[in-house]
């Protein structure tokens, strides 16, 4: 849900206004910030699902005293509200230019995958646990051990 939030902040100079706008723009969900009001002491924040309480608390901490003035839901324009000039103009059909398909280069390296250890089965004869249980079948394929020069043609840039 897109909404407009009007916040009054104790701003007296351009430095404070810039700091307030910068703080508001960095907040999650904010799309646009405008300075409003007769004394340029209000900002209008437009965004999708903006947490206004957290925004006001952040502005209070970083800039100056801030208070919520109003919150309004922004409705998208309806299709029936189109200008009549747009409906009268015939649509010109332009021939579509075919773009050559872009081929993605194949990666030179395979992504790293964690090797699965292979363990010897548990002895079911009841005589205890072997001294080196569990041990991997291949001692060179241990988990966490780096593999050097796996593909010599691969370059990391």
Swiss-Prot record:
Region (Disordered): 73-115
Bilayer-crossing regions: none
Residue positions, PTM Cysteine methyl ester: 154
Propeptide, chain numbering: 155-157
Keywords tagged on the record: Lipoprotein, Metal-binding, Methylation, Prenylation
Record field: compositional bias (Basic and acidic residues): 75-106
Entry annotated with the keyword Nucleus: no
Lipidation (S-farnesyl cysteine): 154
Ranges where the HMA domain occurs: 2-71
Function: Probable heavy-metal-binding protein.
Protein name according to UniProt: Heavy metal-associated isoprenylated plant protein 16
Organism in which the protein naturally occurs: Arabidopsis thaliana
């Amino acid at each position: 849900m897109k909404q407009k939030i009007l916040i009054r902040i104790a701003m007296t100079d351009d430095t404070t206004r810039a700091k307030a706008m910068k703080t508001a723009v960095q907040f999650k969900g904010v799309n646009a910030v405008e300075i409003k009001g007769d004394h340029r002491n209000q900002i209008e924040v437009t965004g999708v699902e903006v947490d206004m309480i957290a925004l006001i608390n952040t502005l209070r901490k970083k800039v100056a005293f801030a208070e919520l003035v109003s919150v309004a839901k922004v409705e998208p324009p309806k299709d029936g509200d189109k200008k009549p000039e747009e409906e009268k103009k015939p649509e010109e059909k332009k021939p579509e230019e075919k773009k050559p398909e872009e081929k993605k280069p194949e990666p030179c390296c395979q992504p790293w995958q964690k090797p699965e250890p292979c363990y010897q089965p548990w002895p079911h004869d009841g005589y205890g646990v072997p001294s080196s249980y569990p041990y991997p079948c291949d001692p060179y394929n241990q988990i966490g051990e780096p593999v050097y020069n796996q593909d010599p043609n691969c370059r990391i840039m």
